[in-house]
């Protein structure tokens, strides 16, 4: 059991935690007092992860998006493809020109590499605006340990912790985040997007962790990956 006896070092705001690779444990929640997630569709379970594909196959955490949040994950795209890591599908309003709603953390495939996009709707009165931060150059068949953090009205950033890569946005961040939907892991919002990535583990905090807390948690996630043979 990839999560048996696991004791998280950083517990502040921790609402969801799971390690994937066993069919009957895909929706479980190892966070202190955590409530199990709802598995929708038929995830493809692999030895060290799970694929939520095609559209409609996802993990609904049941956790409402908060003003601040921090999300850790280890993922791998075997080919240059999309993987939807976190979203708040069926949110209160739509953003952009497509069907993306609310919070979206995903890769965007290119001809030779992928771009990681982190977008969050922010709200002034009745007007919703999408704030986005992105980083290119991600490769296929590579395990990435990622931390994405949103501090409402101040900043949004992410770090690929095992590759020393990061991107952030701190300007024009005065509006609060647009709330009202539950956060989901995996899935795809278009039927023709295969979302062909592998999720290794996920941890969701409903607070913006400090840099020190992120470093401590990352050390523990790295140790777990090493223990189960996920090469970072």
Regions found by a protein language model. Give the residues of each.
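Flexible glycan-contacting loops in extracellular carbohydrate-active proteins
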Residues: 168-199
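Short, aromatic/His-centered strand-loop micro-motif at the edge of beta-sheets
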Residues: 117-145
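Short hydrophobic/aromatic patches on beta-strands that form ligand-binding or substrate-lining surfaces
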Residues: 16-20, 70-78, 146-148, 185, ...
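Beta-strand-rich interaction surfaces with strong enrichment in secreted/lumenal proteins
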Residues: 59-62, 131-137, 171-173
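Extracellular glycan-recognition modules
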Residues: 24-33, 51-117, 206-215
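Extracytoplasmic low-complexity segments
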Residues: 1-55, 70, 215-232
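Extended, low-complexity, turn-rich repeat/linker tracts enriched in Gly/Pro/Ser/Thr and Asp/Glu
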Residues: 78-81, 126, 152-157
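Localized edge beta-strand/strand-to-loop motifs within extracellular or lumenal beta-rich domains
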Residues: 139-157
């Amino acid at each position: 059991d990839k999560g048996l006896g696991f004791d998280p070092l950083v517990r502040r705001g921790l609402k969801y935690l799971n390690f994937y690779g066993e069919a009957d444990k895909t929706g479980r929640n190892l966070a202190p007092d955590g409530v199990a997630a709802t598995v929708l569709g038929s995830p493809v379970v692999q030895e060290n992860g799970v694929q939520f594909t095609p559209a409609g196959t996802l993990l609904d955490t049941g956790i409402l998006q908060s003003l601040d949040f921090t999300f850790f994950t280890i993922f791998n795209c075997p080919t240059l493809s999309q993987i939807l890591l976190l979203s708040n599908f069926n949110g209160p309003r739509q953003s952009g020109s497509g069907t993306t709603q609310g919070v979206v953390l995903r890769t965007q495939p290119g001809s030779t590499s992928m771009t990681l996009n982190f977008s969050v709707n922010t709200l002034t009165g009745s007007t919703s605006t999408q704030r986005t931060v992105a980083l290119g150059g991600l490769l296929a068949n590579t395990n990435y340990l990622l931390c994405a953090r949103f501090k409402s009205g101040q900043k949004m950033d992410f770090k690929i912790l095992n590759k020393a890569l990061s991107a952030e946005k701190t300007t024009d961040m005065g509006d609060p985040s647009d709330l009202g939907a539950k956060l989901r892991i995996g899935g795809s919002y278009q039927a023709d997007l295969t979302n062909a990535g592998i999720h290794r583990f996920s941890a969701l905090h409903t607070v913006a962790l400090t840099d020190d807390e992120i470093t401590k948690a990352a050390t523990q996630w790295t140790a777990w990956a090493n223990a189960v043979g996920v090469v970072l």
